[in-house]
């Protein structure tokens, strides 16, 4: 993992690569394959600052999460691509 530390209520996510083949075996060109909306949390910020103090985040490093296809900002660090997004852009945590 590269040295990247998100601030406040932001999280760093590594996308999980999606299949480039359909269930029927048809290969999808790069432009037709949608970006995956699933990834692994790599790092989390300290929490959201509220009037009552800081609220800790519900996700933690290592969680597998679902997020909107266009959520977050893509950044490249040491040649590796990550997404930085607010915790509120995460739709669900995959358990099990």
Curated annotation (Swiss-Prot):
Disulfide bond entries: none
A Pfam family matched in the record: Cpn10
InterPro entries: Chaperonin_GroES, Chaperonin_GroES_sf, Chaprnonin_Cpn10_CS, GroES-like_sf
GO cellular component: cytoplasm
Entry superkingdom: Bacteria
UniProt keyword annotations, A-Z: Chaperone, Cytoplasm
MF GO annotations: ATP binding; metal ion binding; protein folding chaperone; protein-folding chaperone binding; unfolded protein binding
SMART domains, A to Z: Cpn10 (SM00883)
Gene Ontology BP annotations: chaperone cofactor-dependent protein refolding
Parts forming coiled coils: none
Compartments where located: Cytoplasm
Binding partners and assembly: Heptamer of 7 subunits arranged in a ring. Interacts with the chaperonin GroEL.
Family: Belongs to the GroES chaperonin family.
Function: Together with the chaperonin GroEL, plays an essential role in assisting protein folding. The GroEL-GroES system forms a nano-cage that allows encapsulation of the non-native substrate proteins and provides a physical environment optimized to promote and accelerate protein folding. GroES binds to the apical surface of the GroEL ring, thereby capping the opening of the GroEL channel.
Name of the molecule in the record: Co-chaperonin GroES
Native source organism of the sequence: Acinetobacter baylyi (strain ATCC 33305 / BD413 / ADP1)
Gene: groES
């Amino acid at each position: 993992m590269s040295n990247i530390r998100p601030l406040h209520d932001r999280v760093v996510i590594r996308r999980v690569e999606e299949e480039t083949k359909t269930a029927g075996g048809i290969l999808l060109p790069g432009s037709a394959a949608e970006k995956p909306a699933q990834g692994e949390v790599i790092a989390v910020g300290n929490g959201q600052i509220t009037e009552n103090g800081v609220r800790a985040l519900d996700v933690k490093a290592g969680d597998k999460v679902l997020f909107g296809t266009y959520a977050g900002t893509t950044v490249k660090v040491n040649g590796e691509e990550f997404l930085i997004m607010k915790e509120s852009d995460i739709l669900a945590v995959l358990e099990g």
